[in-house]
Regions:
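Histidine-acidic metal/acid-base catalytic patches
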Residues: 3, 7, 23-45, 49-126
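Surface-exposed cleft-lining segments at the edges of enzyme active sites
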Residues: 14-21
Length: 126
């Protein structure tokens, strides 16, 4: 991937979504990424999965900021749009963008709680 200028994203996933999955925390993925040692292998940090599996989102984001390349957004419970669950998305956005200087990709991977228009509005507000 590195020789071709491509990037690989390593995504830990919750056992709620994939029972028996072997890589379920940001640190387990980070260990693999750091052993590989390529700047083109990054952590895909899925906020929904990591809240379910480890919580403490701010500290895990800070600890792994140097290798995060992509972020999936979905609130808990239900994997709905930001603001519908327990995650403080305005604060996470502040930590990621203002404090850590994250300039990677944010992707909304969710199921709209109400209408698509309401979901799009929440996405724009983010």
């Amino acid at each position: 991937a590195e020789a071709e200028g491509l990037y690989l994203q390593v995504e830990p996933v919750s056992t709620y979504a994939k029972p028996g999955y072997y890589m379920t925390t940001s640190d387990s993925a980070a260990d693999i990424i750091r052993v590989v040692g390529s700047p083109n292998v990054k952590l895909l940090y899925d906020i929904y999965h990591m809240q379910l599996m480890e919580g403490d989102l701010v500290n895990t984001l800070r600890r792994n900021a140097d290798i995060i390349g992509y972020i999936h957004i979905g609130d808990v419970p239900g994997r709905h749009e930001p603001g519908t669950g327990e995650i403080n998305y305005p604060y996470l956005k502040h930590v990621l963008v203002d404090e850590l200087g994250f300039d990677g990709i944010f992707a909304f991977e969710l199921s709209p709680l109400t209408t698509m228009d309401a979901c799009l509005e929440a996405m724009h507000a983010f």
